């Protein structure tokens, strides 16, 4: 199976495209998946080996509906209020990527340019595998 790289994209198509080109230049033959949450500037580049999950109109994740499930969330925590729940949206996008790509992937920020070979990132003995877990609010300690 080919190695998979996932990128969550928000309104910066030139930067995301440059990130993919740098990955291709210094990396192997990876399948790249772009989860597009743009509301102004979607990722429209046609690139071989790149699959776009289009969530620009909430086709995959309706963020307002999902955030409404947590009416008592604290808007003062982190940058949530200042960035329109960007962190929450990013987390939900990564969770959806786990569902869409169950065999695993390396998550890459869209604003990162690769300068050397990154095949070592795929060595299981050298990396951390993450997962998302849910916990009832009663079990969370503050």
Regions found by a protein language model. Give the residues of each.
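N-proximal low-complexity "stem/linker" segments adjacent to membrane-targeting elements
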Residues: 1-21
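Structural beta-sheet core signal
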Residues: 5-7, 34, 107
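Amphipathic coiled-coil/heptad-repeat helices and related helical stalk/stem segments
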Residues: 16, 90-94, 114-116
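Short, acidic, metal-binding catalytic loop of nucleotide-sugar glycosyltransferases
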Residues: 21-30
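Acidic ATP/Mg2+-coordinating residue in the GHKL
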Residues: 36-38
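Active-site-proximal specificity loops/subdomain of glycosyltransferases
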Residues: 43-100
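Short beta-strand-to-loop acidic/aromatic patch adjacent to the donor-nucleotide binding site
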Residues: 78, 102-113
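Conserved catalytic core of nucleotide-sugar-dependent glycosyltransferases
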Residues: 83-84, 114-142
């Amino acid at each position: 199976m080919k190695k998979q790289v996932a990128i969550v994209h928000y309104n910066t198509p030139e930067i995301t495209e440059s990130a993919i080109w740098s990955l291709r230049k210094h990396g192997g033959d990876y399948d790249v998946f772009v989860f597009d949450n743009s509301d102004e500037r979607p990722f429209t580049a046609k690139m071989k080996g790149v699959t776009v999950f289009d969530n620009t109109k909430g086709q995959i994740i309706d963020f307002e509906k999902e955030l409404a499930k947590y009416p008592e969330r604290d808007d003062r925590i982190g940058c949530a209020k200042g960035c329109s729940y960007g962190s929450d949206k990013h987390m939900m996008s990564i969770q959806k990527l786990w569902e869409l790509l169950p065999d695993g992937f390396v998550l890459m920020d869209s604003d990162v340019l690769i300068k050397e070979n990154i095949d070592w990132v795929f060595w299981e003995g050298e990396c951390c595998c993450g997962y998302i877990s849910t916990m009832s609010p009663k079990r969370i300690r503050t």
